[in-house]
C-alpha cells in the first residue's frame, strides 16, 4: 500500500492562506480551484483534488485500483479513446466496460474495462454500434477500439486483444 500523507486540519489553514491545498492521492500541492469542498469538515477542501477524486470514484465503481485508472488516464493522455476529445481535468470521461460481460445493469466486475470515453461515445455512439455490429459495414474507429481497447494494452482486462 502506498504511503499517503494526510493533511492535518490545522495545517490546512496554512495551505488555504497561500491559495493552495495538498492532494493526498497525487501527493501534489495544487491551487484551491482544483479541490471541491467538504461540508463535513467546515467547508475545507476535500483531501483529494477533483481529478484524483474522479479516479477514486471510477476505480471503486469498477472494482479497480486508483493506480489502474490513473494509468489509463495517462495512457490515453486524458482523451476519449474513440473521438480524441481532450479532457484536461478528466471531467467528462467515463470508464467503459463490456456490458455483455456484466449483465446486471449498473454493475461492473472490473475485469472487462475497456477505456475512458466521453459521454457522446460512451452513452451514444458505442452502444448503438454494438447493437448493429455485424449487420452494417464496420466503422474503423469503433472496430479499432473494440478489438484493441486501451485497457487491454495495459494488461488491465481479462479479455485479450481481438475479443469484444
Region roles according to the model:
Residues 2-164:
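Contiguous alpha-helical segments
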